[in-house]
Each structure stands twice: as C-alpha cells, then as structure tokens.
Amino acid sequence: MKCIILLAVLGTAFAQRNGFCRLPADEGICKALIPRFYFNTETGKCTMFSYGGCGGNENNFETIEECQKACGAPERVNDFESADFKTGCEPAADSGSCAGQLERWFYNVQSGECETFVYGGCGGNDNNYESEEECELVCKNM
C-alpha cells in the first residue's frame, strides 16, 4: 500500500513538473526577437524559437541546457545515426527566417571543412550544427 501511494505521489509530481513541456512554443504578446528554447513534443527535442519578451508560457528556456534538464535531453549520438550527407552536409549555410544572432557550424562542400555562420534561430536547413565537433562527426565521417 505504501509503495502504491509513493508511486502515485511521485508520478503526480513528475507530471506537474514536466506538464509545461507539452505546451506549444508561444512567442508572447511583445515584439522583441529573443532567441529561446522550447521542448518540441513532435521531435522530442529542445528547439529554438523567437520570444517576444513578455507573455508566453512556461515552455520557454534561455538555454538549451535548461530546456533539456527540465524536459529531457536527446541522445546526441542517435540524432546522427540516420544522418544523410545530401541533406545534412551539402546544402549551403542558411540563416533561417528569424533575426537571432547565433554562431553555428555548417559543412562547406567546397572547402571540405566545417565553418561558422550566423543562424537566426528558426528555419534554415539540416546543415546547421551547434559545434565544430558535431559538424565534423556527421559530415567528415560519411
């Protein structure tokens, strides 16, 4: 009986703690373009979006690490198991449609090297990596 009660309490606490992770990205009512992260239930990953600066909901984190801690970190190795050179390494760098200023890495097929570019925070293509190491792991090992 004590085990059942303990499991019920823990399950309720976990659901309450992470319930906001199921909320959609909400830019809020203001018009700033602040890069933030939300947990995307469709992909099971923390994804960047542009936050307006006020309003919104609790599925809104300043860093990807905060988002992953609250809602679950993806297995980075598994992210790249099905990587495709044509879509993940061949396209040119694409800044996307938002106005953020994030340093990212892309594979330049002309130079055969991973290089930096400025990512706006949303949109773009799959040739977009958080680190040089991540870019090289995917594109130089294919």
Swiss-Prot record:
Keywords: Blood coagulation cascade inhibiting toxin, Disulfide bond, Hemostasis impairing toxin, Platelet aggregation inhibiting toxin, Protease inhibitor, Pyrrolidone carboxylic acid, Repeat, Secreted, Serine protease inhibitor, Signal, Toxin. It comes from Rhipicephalus microplus (Cattle tick). The modification Pyrrolidone carboxylic acid is found at Q16. Residues 21-71, 89-139 form the BPTI/Kunitz inhibitor domain. CDD domains: Kunitz_boophilin_1-like, Kunitz_boophilin_2-like. This is Boophilin-H2. The N-terminus is blocked. The keyword Phosphoprotein does not apply. Disulfide bonds join C21-C71, C30-C54, C46-C67, C89-C139, C98-C122, C114-C135. Residues 1-15 form the signal peptide. It is found in: Secreted. GO terms for molecular function: serine-type endopeptidase inhibitor activity; toxin activity. Expressed in the midgut. InterPro entries: Kunitz_BPTI (IPR002223), Kunitz_BPTI_sf (IPR036880), Prtase_inh_Kunz-CS (IPR020901), TFPI/VKTCI-like (IPR050098).
